[in-house]
Every structure is written in C-alpha cells, then in structure tokens.
Amino acid sequence: MSPAHPERRRQLANTPNTELKGGLKSRHLTMMSIAGVIGAALFVGSGKQIALAGPAVILAYVGGGILVILAMRMLGEMAVAQPDTGSFSTYADRAIGRWAGFTIGWLYWYFWALLMGWEAYVAGQILHGWFPLVPAWGYALLVTVSLLIVNFLNVRNYGEFEFWFALIKVVAIVLFLVMGSLALAHLWPWGEANGWSHLTSQGFMPNGPKSVVVALLGVMFAFIGAEIVTVAAAESADPGREIIKTTRSVVWRICLFYVGSIFIVVCLVPYNAPGLTEPTHGTYNVALDALGIPHAQLIVNFIVLTSVCSCFNSALYTASRMLYSLARRGDAHRIMQITGRKTGTPYVGVLISSLFAFAAVWMMATSKMDVYDVLMQATGTIALFVYLAIAFSQLRMRQRLQARGVRLEFRMWLFPWLTYAVIVCIVAALVTMVIEGTYRNEVVYTSILAGVIVAMGIVAQVFGIGTRARAEAELAPAGAE
C-alpha cells in the first residue's frame, strides 16, 4: 500500500461530511404530505374564520385550497425536473436571481424556526393542564429536547415519527367525517346536532362578502406546510416519482380534510356558537360537544397535542434542510452544511434552528411570551410570499426550458395563464390585507423583514460573498441558459 494512503485517510477523516444520506420511504412521504396540511389550525384555529364569515367560510377554504393546489402544481413541475433540498428557494435562485433565493430561503427558515417556539408553548400548556405539578415551560422544554434528539438521528427516524403523528391525525379526521356525515343524514343517535339546519338558518353569508375575503387571508396561514414534501423528497430513493404522486394527491387531501371538515362543522354548529373562537375550545371541540361525544375537550386536546408535536417535528426538519441548502449555495455560513458521517443529518442546522424554541421556553418561564407574539406577527404573510416566489420562478424556468426544447415529465396546467392568475390573486390578497386593516400589521412586519433580507441578498450577490460555495454546488446563475 502506498505510504500516501495513511495521510489520505487522515485528510478524509478531518474533512467535514456535507452530504445527506437520505432514507425516507414512500410511506413516509405519503403521510408527510398529508400531515403537512393538517395542523392545529384545522382542529382549533378554524373556529375564528367560521365566526368571521359564517357558513360562507367554505368558500374561503375552497378559494385558499385552489391557490395552494396551483402553487403545488407549479412547484411540482420544478421539483420533478430538478429535485433539490432547497426546493423553491433554489428554484428562485436559478430563475430570478441569487437575491430572490436568498430572501425566500431565509424568510421560510424564519417562519418554521419561530413556529417551533409557538408549538412548544401550546404543547406545554396542554400537558400542564393534564399534569399541573410540572410548570408549562418544563413540558415545553421536554418536547423541544425530545424532538431535537429525533432530528439529530438519521432522517428515517424523523420519517417514522411523522408517519405515526400523521396517522393519528388522519384517523381523527376520518372518524369526525363519518360521525358528522351520519348526523347530517339524521342517523346519529346522540347529541343535539342533526341535519343541515345551521348552513342557512342565519344566512349563508351573514357578515357579507367582505368577511369571506378576510377569512380567506386567515385561511392561507393554515395551508402552509403542503410544500414540505418537495424538500423531503430529495432524501428519498426516487424524488421525481414521489413528488408527482404527492402533488397529485394534494387535491383530494385539501377537499376531504379541510373543506369536508369545515362543511360538516358549519352544518352542525351555528357560526356564532360560544367557544368557536376560544383557544381552550375550538372548532372540533364545539362540534364534538354538539354530537354528544363525552370528554370532547380531552379528545381534542390529545389530537392538538399530536398536531403541534408533528408540526414541531416537521418545522425542525424543514428549517434545518433550508439552512443546509442556503449554506451549500453560499447564502449561510458553511458550518450549516456539515452533516453527521453516520446519520447524514445536518446537525448544526438542526441545533441552530431549534434556538427559537429554547427562547420560547425561557420566555414562558419568565412570563415574557408577549415578546414572542410580536415576533410571530412577522410570519403572517410568509406563505403568500412563498407562493408568489414559486409562481415567478415557474414562469421563468418553464420559458427557459421550452426555449431549450426540454420535455417536462410533470407540467403546470394551462401555462402561462394559470400562473399569471396565481400571481394576480396573491398580489390582490396582499393589497386587500393592507387596505382592509385586519392583517395590516402582518403584511407590514413581513414586508419590513423581507426588505432587510432582500438588501442582504443583493449585497451578497453584488460583492460575490459565498461564490466559492456556489461554484462547488454547481449552481447555474439565474441568467444562464
């Protein structure tokens, strides 16, 4: 053996690993794609939108669902052609410019990193309600550390946890749909809720068309997460096939789980029912009470606890992978792309992404969660910014691929007209949010945050910061053909 071999081995041993190992199976991705659109916003938060718009909130969920379906179709087209852990952030980089990928990547990371703290807070409150001997912040810390350990292990562990979290949520929704359908058909033997009476008894749109528009803006927050599967698919054996399958299924998932559930609720429960807007009750709790289900609050709290743990788990995974992708492109410190040699997990990114959760635990312990609420306001419209970036990226990438004669395996419908329609709808929604006032602060705070990040991205692009990492990642510049 050459004497250079031992030296070569030492060099390799001292060189940080920067490759993901993968390991997600098809069943993991299937359930992750379902879990991505089912969260506490459905089980509890939807009550606020129902109280706002009445039964016509169904139109808001249908409208929001259509927008998400179109955004996922556009993202699916790009992801099948070029699977990447950075997903839409990478595509924005290639199609629009480095500043765009930089901005949307960091905004998306901020959203999920901050959301983890809120999920830990909710989990802590639920567990404290069950077992009051331990303070809520103690339970929040326990949840944070436990799921941090899960994400430190290989990606298959994350997939397994998310599979079972998602399964619990799916079973809960299916049972609710069955019970609700029986009640609508006058076949449910318990409770006071039977038939369709509340759908029109106080008017289908009691607060006017404007309330539906405002509710639609709130609904958009609930749908974010559907795109996570395009990030995770890059760590599977056949990313293209998995993305096609899950993207096609997003239509029935949104129709069944969201529109179906909300339709049953507004039929069985008056839109002004006490408890719909209370955090301690929520949509499913009020509906189950109407169906005469004993211990409804305990059941819903268990489902919500599962949902927030699932969301925390997905948030930590997604945030760490976005940091990894940003680092690979020279848009974050290169230490963020270091992965474990055995696990292939970007453990530095996982740890950094969890810091907001630990900050939330500290704020809970010191009664300063109002500060966290202010930070959360800057996340309110990030979903719309993400969908806008997806639409512009798909528009540019499709035009370039068509010019080169590339045949796409998965395509956006009615291109470019539906893409233009999505852009117009999102811009109109943002303008409406500013004019109407209910979500004005969210738009302003998110826009300020985005403006700061855009400026940083432009500086990085102009001065060539991180160009070595970009060259190693073999990223074509946005204007390349």
Regions found by a protein language model. Give the residues of each.
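C-terminal membrane-solvent junction of multi-pass transporters and transport-like membrane proteins
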Residues: 164-165, 336-343, 384-436
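Helix-loop-helix connectors at the membrane interface of multi-pass transporters/channels
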Residues: 1-4, 8, 89-94, 99, ...
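Membrane-interface "cap" regions at the ends of multi-pass membrane proteins
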Residues: 1-47, 51-56, 68-73, 85, ...
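TM-loop-TM module centered on a large, flexible mid-protein loop between adjacent transmembrane helices
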Residues: 90-92, 97, 129, 215, ...
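Extracellular loop-to-transmembrane helix junctions
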Residues: 21, 44-140, 253, 259-260, ...
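Helix-loop-helix junctions that connect adjacent transmembrane segments
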Residues: 15-20, 57-58, 132-135, 167-302
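Membrane-interface loop-to-helix entry segments
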Residues: 124, 137-194, 224, 247-255, ...
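A generic transmembrane alpha-helix motif of multi-pass inner-membrane proteins
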Residues: 183-184, 374, 378-386, 414-481
